């Protein structure tokens, strides 16, 4: 029956305790379901009628502070390290960060439509990631003349991809822009 806010840590990664998974809603925890060997299966939260979130300050010019913010806010758990698609190890500097702003899958949502009205936040997020490592932003040719671009941040490269699926796949974009292995 604990009360949680949006962004309140629910649990941590037992291998890397800095990596947290946070509450997506504010409300009251109603159930914690565990499986074999106490494996966490689900956490149920009864949402409040009004959502209240924890506030986080965006760091100005420090890559390490950006990583700390990602860890504290629970967003670090959504990052993926290639080639094994695992959560990256905090404290290990990445070579590059890839962000794909489109999906070429059939019936996929149009990211430009989804991000409408949040272009400033999107650009601030890309600029913050660029303080950690060079960012490669993958877009399709239809997005070149949208409010998502241009992004005027150092260390941000915009790469335009076109073609059928899997052109929007991050792995394909990595292979075309900066391959993990050139062998």
Regions found by a protein language model. Give the residues of each.
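N-terminal, Lys/Arg-enriched amphipathic/low-complexity engagement segments
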Residues: 1, 12, 44-46
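Buried, small/hydrophobic-residue-enriched core segments of structured protein domains
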Residues: 33-183
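Generic structural motif
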Residues: 4-7, 16-31
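Residues immediately C-terminal
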Residues: 9-12, 104
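Generic short alpha-helical segment signal, independent of protein family or function
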Residues: 12-15, 34
